[in-house]
Amino acid sequence: METITLNEARRVIDAAEEKAREIDCPMDIAVVDAGGNLKAHVRMDGAFIGSINISINKAYTAIAFQTETKELAPLAQPGEELFGLNDAAGGDLVIFAGGIPLKRNGDIEGAIGVSTGTVDQDQEVAEAGAEAFQTVGN
């Protein structure tokens, strides 16, 4: 199984930080490896302390379910097939936008999780990091 390297994780975080600065919203940004283990994390000056674990858990959730966290919210509503998911695993699963698997050549090698802004801002910053992963090594 291929997994993200520390150097690649740093480049992902750098790209996400750049987008966060561009939209003027300091963020907590986490990258996990293919096994869901924390590879790198940064809390930008001004980012919420409460968002540290949320960013890490978004990345973990994205790798654990191999999908963007924003895709899980509709499925976790009352009456839906994944209702209660956000309470599973000790509350470590996050079902709103900002977590994205990092894919290369169709394989998931890690994930990014971003938190502090609105869910749209978190998603935008996570997308910038995920896009940067596509160019690592190219």
Identify the role of each PLM range:
Residues 1-138:
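Flexible, solvent-exposed loop/hinge segments and secondary-structure transition points
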